[in-house]
Amino acid sequence: MENFRYEIESMLQLVGVDMDVISVDPYSDEKLAEFVSELLLWNKKINLIGKSTEKSIWSRHIAESLILLPYVQGSTVLDMGTGAGLPGLPLQIVSGSNIEMHLVEKDQKKVSFLKHVSANLNLKNIRIYNKQFTEKGFDGAPLVNVVTSRALAEINQLVAWADPCLVNGGSLVLIKGPVCKAELEKFEESDLSDKYENGEIVEYKIDSHDVNIVIIKKK
């Protein structure tokens, strides 16, 4: 996609973000293009994204990841079940050294892709873990102030997995589908919800595609 810097700025303006307070890597255009190229190449060998979404990769995967940018600035971030590095890698590419990113993925083949593309793009402040999440976290898990996830599990399960890694005052920032309201209500009736403030749902639309961001802050 040509002139993706314009696309980034337009998207951030759409969500009401002042570009003057957002750190954007000056080489993010080229790095995002290379990331997409590598993702499509590797997708021929291993299942990183759905084949039907390849043609809309910029809106369906990249832009959808980057709507989290306002919520992670200056943070230590853990991306649970990152898969192809979504949303973690686009956030890290655009933010540069402004955030510290931890990517967690249990599939060894996907981890190989994450390590390959991170090295090729010379990404800094990033760690990759080949680990399985449990409700006790995982061996070597960092403490972070933001946990992200995209299309991984229900909110109840995501909070249980994230809780050991999330500091008090930190937040889960989750990309969810249309059933997120029911999932959030179910979580707020659970015992674990006592440790968290009431969740918030922020709705976005990208190229007629509805995207819901669920934000849950730990007390």
UniProtKB/Swiss-Prot annotation:
A Gene Ontology cellular-component term: cytosol
UniProt keyword terms in alphabetical order: Cytoplasm, Methyltransferase, rRNA processing, S-adenosyl-L-methionine, Transferase
Catalyses which reaction(s): guanosine(527) in 16S rRNA + S-adenosyl-L-methionine = N(7)-methylguanosine(527) in 16S rRNA + S-adenosyl-L-homocysteine
Pfam families: GidB
TM segment ranges: none
Lineage top rank: taxon: Bacteria
UniProt: S-adenosyl-L-methionine binding residues: 81, 86, 150
E.C. no: 2.1.1.170
Known role: Specifically methylates the N7 position of guanine in position 527 of 16S rRNA.
PANTHER family xref list: S-ADENOSYL-L-METHIONINE-DEPENDENT METHYLTRANSFERASES SUPERFAMILY PROTEIN
Name the record gives this protein: Ribosomal RNA small subunit methyltransferase G
Gene that this polypeptide is encoded by: rsmG
